Amino acid sequence: MSFVFAVPEMVAATASDLASLGAALSEATAAAAIPTTQVLAAAADEVSAAIAELFGAHGQEFQALSAQASAFHDRFVRALSAAAGWYVDAEAANAALVDTAATGASELGSGGRTALILGSTGTPRPPFDYMQQVYDRYIAPHYLGYAFSGLYTPAQFQPWTGIPSLTYDQSVAEGAGYLHTAIMQQVAAGNDVVVLGFSQGASVATLEMRHLASLPAGVAPSPDQLSFVLLGNPNNPNGGILARFPGLYLQSLGLTFNGATPDTDYATTIYTTQYDGFADFPKYPLNILADVNALLGIYYSHSLYYGLTPEQVASGIVLPVSSPDTNTTYILLPNEDLPLLQPLRGIVPEPLLDLIEPDLRAIIELGYDRTGYADVPTPAALFPVHIDPIAVPPQIGAAIGGPLTALDGLLDTVINDQLNPVVTSGIYQAGAELSVAAAGYGAPAGVTNAIFIGQQVLPILVEGPGALVTADTHYLVDAIQDLAAGDLSGFNQNLQLIPATNIALLVFAAGIPAVAAVAILTGQDFPV
């Protein structure tokens, strides 16, 4: 299907030609600036001076209009280039599904085995080197004779993958649709399938696993036809950040903390690198060192999966589960280096780091509960507490449940559905206008990069207080309802979630501006 890329190539070529034309026009405009704006009077009389002033004013107006035209031209070129990219992505998605169907058809009746590999945020089409690495380490040792291929997913996460782009929720939902189609095509062709998802790809697989579990018998693939391998899973039941704070919603990111990956009929293996901030987030966020270590682990540990040696993967620790009937195996890959100390390496002498790391690791581990079952969804808490439920008259719950639920819903609607979208769109619009103005004045690349990073970061920071209010209200309502229902354990858990969530959000609120400042000062993109 190579012909489908002809149009994007033409569009890209046109964008390149327009960019060259824009550069030529800018040079011509700049060359004409002084002769047209600083016209000298032909003589010393008032009439000559007035004529010179008139022509000079027209020249200045021309320069102003040229700057606006240049900014518009620049935006048009960028939009044209982006359109070509979007076209390629859409065609690649269709091609991926068609290729998958063709592969399945060619292997019909031959007992084919296919490994579908998904990428992470920012990698809609997994590169070959990445696929080869994860296949060798996580698929080949357990699934013999499988041929791997990459599956296109949007892999977007506004604002980190651009403005505009799909939110995390939208991207994962769309990716799950592609994955379901690919799985069903392969199974219909008589092939066995193993799905490998990394990071956002693991969240895509999580949605698909939930969907398959909801299908009636005879519609979903049988357990001997399908398996899953997940790496750096944000939905890890005991450690995934999307399961640590269930029900939390961050409107500025379009991100719902949608809970744990289910244990289904399909054999599943979940690999987690220790201190990966997405997949191994602390249970007790009151431990600030553990929080900061996990935040840095997003950068230093989350990308380790495809760089580990086969021996390191094989030495992973199989975590305990609640039942021998569990179909999911959870493997923790020990991290030899604390992410908290990684920025200091090369600056602080290694012997000193080696001296403090064991004690620091012991303190950080206090933020975790490694004794819990890996398959049990485990939300954040303040400290280990075990309280048995007591009986409370049920009429109390009936009296207060309705108004509290209404309050929770009202705050969520006002803040997340009404106020926050206005704030986000306003900041995006202001950033776009600043970018145009900067281009008009010929601002250096560092300035335009700073404006774009500001567009990405400011909505998160401005809307932070609203996220705290809605999260705290949600957990408080749940706590009171648990108390009214006689569930002191649930009451205690939800009360602990309030400060635990606040601490985690505040740590991120401090870390994001720091990372943004470094990116601006170094002229780099905000790291994703």
UniProtKB/Swiss-Prot annotation:
Q: Which UniProt keywords apply?
A: Hydrolase, Membrane, Serine esterase, Transmembrane, Transmembrane helix
Q: Which SUPFAM superfamilies match?
A: alpha/beta-Hydrolases, PE/PPE dimer-like
Record field: temperature dependence:
Optimum temperature is 37-38 degrees Celsius.
Activity regulation as described: Esterase activity is significantly inhibited by the serine modifier phenylmethylsulfonyl fluoride (PMSF).
Catalysed reaction per UniProt? a hexanoate ester + H2O = an aliphatic alcohol + hexanoate + H(+); an octanoate ester + H2O = an aliphatic alcohol + octanoate + H(+); a butanoate ester + H2O = an aliphatic alcohol + butanoate + H(+)
- GO molecular function terms attached to this record: carboxylic ester hydrolase activity
**Membrane-topology descriptor:** Single-pass membrane protein
**Broad class of the protein's primary localization:** membrane
**What sequence ranges are listed for the domain PE?**
1-93
Q: What is the effect of changing S199A?
A: Loss of activity
pH effect on activity, per entry = Optimum pH is 7.0-8.0.
A Pfam family that the UniProt record links to this protein: PE
Q: What is its EC number?
A: 3.1.1.-
Q: Which GO terms describe its cellular component?
A: membrane
- The top EC class, named as a word, is hydrolase
Membrane-crossing segments per the record: 503-523
Q: Which domain of life is it from?
A: Bacteria
List every stretch annotated Linker: 94-143
Q: Which residues form the active site?
A: S199
Domain PE-PPE positions: 149-369
Where in or outside the cell is it found? Membrane
Described purpose of this protein according to its UniProt entry: Esterase that hydrolyzes short to medium chain fatty acid esters with the highest specific activity for p-nitrophenyl caproate (pNPC6). Has lower activity with p-nitrophenyl caprylate (pNPC8) and p-nitrophenyl butyrate (pNPC4). Has weak activity with p-nitrophenyl caprate (pNPC10) and p-nitrophenyl laurate (pNPC12). Does not possess lipolytic activity and cutinase activity.
Give the protein family: Belongs to the mycobacterial PE family.
Name of protein:
Esterase PE16
